[in-house]
């Protein structure tokens, strides 16, 4: 996992260079960010001698009890169709089989929250669908109904003082590449102002969480960043101090605090939100009372980044359960005159209500017999653009259009009812979405992996099952050709890690405490952006979880490795086939899979394949 983290950081090294080249004056608009991917991997495939693997003892993850209400489960798994429409009911074929895997006493820590929020989300979605149906039947379809996820929102000329004001509403949240540009003038008579990203309400909480609080204090110049939830209160403050060295930690290859401003200090806040005093060099402080500034807050893969007048000032890593897709509003308090604020690159779907959907973009019908390959694409609610890029690119391979290969998106519900309504429209239009009966959280990805195994053994039986992500490009032709040379059973195929250890650094996205995995290393596992298992392994996973012989684990790709290790020792020797043409972090010619591709790059790769018939990278 450490190798994976270094790869992610390397990717964003180019972003930081581009950020330093920005020239942002006092104006309303700033340049949007371009994420560029560069890595290197050589092409090599080999089959591993697994005799040593077979002899290792099986270790199961530690089991912790987490409970949810039966009422929520009963609602989510009631017999009636929520939608009453065959097209969307077909998107719940896995959903209907998931209950036994959710109500186990050793469920993943976030399962209860994910199910509670899914119940609220589903109730809201049913109301939205019924409201839209009434609007269509009465002929009163407004632009608001047709376009509920705008690609940008803006506001101008607001004089804020004292109480907190909602500056912008963000109907469908934020995603990687989104940015918020604010032009303002601090009040000469005020000692501070705050910019807050407020989230959708969490289950069981009456007050909305603060996904990010950016507190600017003039009395003793400071920039303090933090989060807040009703349940946990304020988290650990992160603030700059002029004297001392920087912490050796980066977010998207950017420092937590600009070296010219100071060093970062992390301390626990008191619940009364008292700002701790610190000393900063006034000369380097990016804000000045009475002087206008342009602030660009943008969203990377790992965290938030703030640029003031063209200079990167602070970064703040996303905290668990407080992801950017939860953000629903921008609030400002304190003394600040707002000249303009603009949120751009927001998640938007295609307007399915006004466009005639091309037949070639719809999921083709299947014969009902076992297919060669099922590809499960892990996606989240507001990643509309990514899914459309896949539908218009590698999902157009003849093997997919003919039904030899099936591709399905596995998506959990969203806490935002508008995003869920757009997903409902999307599912109805394309027929390639399988909904999950929980709200998407990183800690629940392993449940999606189990769901994919159910899909590939019970719903769309397939000889091979592949897991990939919605920012990956897959060469279906090369993959099928390679699988012809592989065994049809007891197979794990992809970019395999044979010597990795748990990340013990608290705060890391991949942090695993010793009580969850006490060993110093993991069994062999294939990197999550793309791996293939045989039908018998998928069947073993489903049966093992139904009978609760297999434990759940937070990291889905490592979890699959743990389950396969048990298959290897109890059922049949596994062939671990490592193929370095599965690029989990870069693009290199002669690839089978490349990860971290934007929608633009996905379409570019497809165009190059069509024109040149070669797997050539775009950048």
From Swiss-Prot:
SUPFAM superfamilies according to UniProt: Concanavalin A-like lectins/glucanases
Sugar-bearing residue positions: 79, 217, 568, 613
EC number in record: 2.4.1.-
Cofactor(s) required, per the database record: Mn(2+)
Tissue spec. comment: Expressed in juvenile leaves, stems, cauline leaves and siliques.
TM region(s), chain numbering: 21-37
Role noted for this protein: Possesses hydroxyproline O-galactosyltransferase activity. Transfers galactose from UDP-galactose to hydroxyproline residues in the arabinogalactan proteins (AGPs). Is specific for AGPs containing non-contiguous peptidyl hydroxyproline residues. Utilizes UDP-galactose solely as sugar donor. The addition of galactose onto the peptidyl hydroxyproline residues in AGP core proteins represents the first committed step in arabinogalactan polysaccharide addition. AGP glycans play essential roles in both vegetative and reproductive plant growth.
Protein name: Hydroxyproline O-galactosyltransferase GALT3
Species classification: Eukaryota, Viridiplantae, Streptophyta, Embryophyta, Tracheophyta
């Amino acid at each position: 996992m450490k190798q994976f983290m270094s790869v992610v950081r390397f990717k964003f090294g180019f972003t930081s260079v581009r950020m330093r080249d920005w020239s942002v004056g006092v104006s309303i608009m700033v340049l949007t960010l371009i994420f560029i991917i560069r890595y290197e991997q050589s092409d090599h495939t080999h089959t591993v001698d697994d005799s040593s693997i077979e002899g290792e003892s099986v270790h199961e993850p530690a089991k912790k009890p987490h409970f949810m209400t039966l009422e929520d489960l009963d609602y989510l798994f009631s017999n009636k169709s929520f939608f009453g429409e065959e097209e969307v009911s077909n998107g719940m074929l896995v959903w209907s089989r998931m209950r036994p895997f959710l109500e186990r006493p050793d469920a993943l820590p976030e399962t209860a929250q994910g199910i509670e929020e899914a119940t609220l989300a589903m109730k809201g979605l049913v109301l939205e669908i019924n409201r839209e149906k009434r609007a269509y039947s009465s002929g009163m379809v407004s632009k608001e109904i047709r376009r509920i996820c705008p690609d940008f929102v803006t506001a101008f000329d607001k004089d804020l003082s004292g109480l907190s004001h909602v500056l912008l509403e963000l109907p469908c949240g934020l995603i990687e590449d989104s940015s918020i540009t604010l032009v303002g003038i601090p009040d000469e008579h005020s000692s501070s102002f705050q910019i807050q990203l407020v989230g959708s309400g969490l289950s069981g909480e009456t007050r909305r969480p603060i996904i990010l609080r950016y507190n600017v204090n003039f009395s003793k110049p400071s920039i303090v960043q933090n989060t807040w939830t009703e349940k946990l209160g304020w988290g650990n403050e992160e603030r700059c101090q002029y004297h001392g060295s920087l912490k050796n930690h980066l977010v998207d290859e950017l420092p937590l605090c600009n070296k010219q401003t100071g060093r970062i200090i992390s301390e626990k806040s008191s619940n009364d939100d008292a700002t701790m005093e610190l000393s900063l060099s006034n000369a380097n402080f990016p804000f000045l009372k009475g002087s206008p500034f342009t602030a660009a807050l943008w969203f990377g893969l790992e965290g938030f980044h703030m640029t003031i007048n063209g200079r990167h000032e602070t970064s703040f890593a996303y905290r668990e359960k407080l992801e950017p897709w939860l953000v629903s509003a921008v609030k400002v308090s304190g003394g600040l005159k707002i000249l303009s604020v603009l949120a751009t690159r927001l998640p938007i779907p295609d307007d399915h209500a006004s466009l005639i959907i091309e037949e070639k973009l719809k999921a083709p019908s299947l014969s009902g017999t076992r297919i060669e390959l099922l590809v499960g694409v892990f996606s989240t609610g507001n990643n509309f653009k990514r899914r459309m890029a896949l539908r218009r690119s590698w999902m157009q391979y003849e093997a997919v259009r003919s039904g030899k290969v099936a591709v399905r998106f596995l998506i959990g519900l969203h806490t935002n009812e508008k995003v869920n309504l757009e997903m409902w429209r999307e599912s109805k239009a394309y027929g390639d979405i399988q909904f999950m009966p929980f709200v998407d959280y990183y800690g629940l990805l392993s449940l999606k992996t189990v769901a994919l195994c159910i899909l590939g053994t019970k719903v769309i039986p397939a000889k091979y099952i592949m897991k990939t992500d919605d920012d990956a490009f897959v060469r279906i032709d090369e993959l099928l050709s390679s699988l012809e040379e592989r065994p049809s059973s007891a197979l794990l195929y992809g970019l395999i890690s044979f010597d990795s250890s748990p990340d013990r650094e608290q705060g890391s996205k991949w942090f695993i405490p010793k009580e969850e995995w006490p060993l110093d290393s993991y069994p062999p596992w294939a990197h999550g952006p793309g791996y293939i298992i045989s039908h018998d392994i998928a069947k073993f996973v489903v049966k093992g979880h139904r009978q609760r012989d297999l434990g759940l684990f937070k990291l889905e790709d490592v979890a699959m490795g743990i389950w396969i290790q048990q298959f290897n020792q109890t059922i049949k020797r596994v062939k671990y086939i490592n193929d370095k043409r599965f690029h989990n972090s870069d693009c290199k010619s002669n690839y089978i899979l490349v990860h971290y591709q934007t929608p633009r790059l996905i379409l570019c790769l497809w165009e190059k394949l069509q024109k040149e018939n070669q797997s050539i990278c775009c950048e």
